Amino acid sequence: LQDHLQLRITYRLNKPISFNDQYHSYLEKIKIGMEYYIKRSGPMAYPTAQVGLFTRSSPLIDTPDIQYHFSNYTIDEKTGLPDKFPGMTFSVCHLRPQSRGEILLRSTDADQHPRIIPNYLSTAEDCRVAIEEIRLTRKIAATEPLASVVDAELDPGPDVLTDEQCLDFARSN
């Protein structure tokens, strides 16, 4: 099994400009629904991620090995709904991880789900890229004009500073 781990790095914004704000406003929901119904445009016509980016984790490699999806919302993990404050999410993944997992049958019963062992971050290179993904995302968020609307990093959080802390976040994500 080869799969790429998706890290979600989230930020609280200092202005009501995210989908979170629209979602929690009854009037905005009506506007969104009407815009889609009449024009087939607006937030209901958008993909989940409106911005994508391919980049390299190191200048020493030839082709991009990191992919970003940027979404103008954050999700409350308890409810599965957009948070009640403005937010944005960077979903970042390593495109060509070296780590390999496995899928195992639990029994001969076809109704039994298989046992999936992704084995993420099992190589030093995959760990290096995960750390770089977090550091690079922080650089992007600290760059204008984006920096002017960022209020705070939520996940992994401003206290996550060392390589080991970044890896702990990646492993728990």
Model-derived regions: residue spans:
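Acidic/histidine-rich catalytic neighborhood
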Residues: 3-32
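FAD-dependent oxidoreductase catalytic-site/capping-region signature
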Residues: 17, 28, 32-173
